[in-house]
Amino acid sequence: MKDETLPNGRVWPLGATCHDGGVNFALFSSGARSVTLCVFDTDGRETHRYAMNGPVNNVWHGFLPDTGTGLIYGYRVDGPYDPSRGLRYNPARLLLDPYARRLHGEFQWHESHLDRPDTQMDDNAAYMPKAVVTGVHEFDWEGDRRPNIPMCESVIYEVHVKGFTKAHPDVPTELRGTYEGMASPAAIAHLKRLGVTAVELLPVQESVSEGTLIEMGLCNYWGYNTLAFFAPDRRFARQDPVNEFRHMVKELHRHGIEVILDVVYNHTPEGDQRGPTLSWRGLDNQAYYHLSRQDPAYYANYTGTGNSVNASNYVALQMIMDSLRYWVQEMHVDGFRFDLASVLGRVALPNSNDPGRFDRYAPFFQAVRQDPALAGIKLIAEPWDAAGGGYQL
């Protein structure tokens, strides 16, 4: 398939943005030699490839005219492959846009995802979900206002969207397991009887199950393995995950109940050096992860999952902050509970073999403190991680 070259686009905002009768694509990759935008039909067949322009300040860009919402796409990034230097570029891997707001297709575990010598040339596109271009979602918030309940008066109820609504006998059968079920009169009445002022939803961003679970015929029910930090999980939607999530928030707010999200920015599903290349590893491994100082082919494992997101790097930090702002401004959530929050405060010290020691003044904490979009939002930290120095209670 011959690549066409896209007209120049804008380097900001990152992700896919509809404007002027087309879509602007912007993707960060500091070490890439080339970036290719791959377009797919609804059956998962690749129909076009477009060469991106750049980089400009490490951002590759392009404008695809005469298209818009619903376009299905992924990226291929070519660059040096040298794990000993922390470089893992591989154009055989179709990569998910970290800024994807909706996904198409299901993730399937397959050896073509794995970063092994015997699978380097294997194409993984058939087993990857793709990003879907979304525009401005039309939704009537009907004057929605945050309840703004003081923390000292809050009664926070941790709940799994599917588990809670599946188990409640008065939630309509067709709504069980969904965002709409959480917004049903029966669910809200139950919460009100308990005196709940806020629901803390276990992870509702798109996630995948670990390979070891799949091999045992199981799944990661809880969702602590996030694949798309901007996309509401389709498992809990009937048709439109974005607007059904918004409807849930609006209804809960209408009854004085806040919505707090349990978020997992400390690691990704890409695991350790033997894990799959799905997005960040293939886009810019050195930027997104804490790597071993002694051997950058290995990852610093502060999370117990195989990798740790480097929130002190500006591009990883920008992704996290952009995601938080999206959920606050576009989805009207009232707060966040940060899983293994100590990881987000780990920074690399000069002349140290430790790639990340905890610092209470780390870039992530400073960024959150100064962001006006997050002012007044409830912020809850799990004050530890799985490594030395991480217990910060």
Residue locations for each model-derived region?
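N-terminal structural segment of carbohydrate-active enzymes
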Residues: M1-R235
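Beta-sheet entry/capping signal
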Residues: N24-A26, S154-V155, T197-E200, G256-E258, ...
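Proline-centered flexible-loop/turn and helix-kink motifs
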Residues: S30, A373-A375
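Nucleotide-sugar donor-binding loop of glycosyltransferases
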Residues: G31, V263, P383
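Structural signature of outer-membrane beta-barrel domains
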Residues: D82, V343-G345, A386
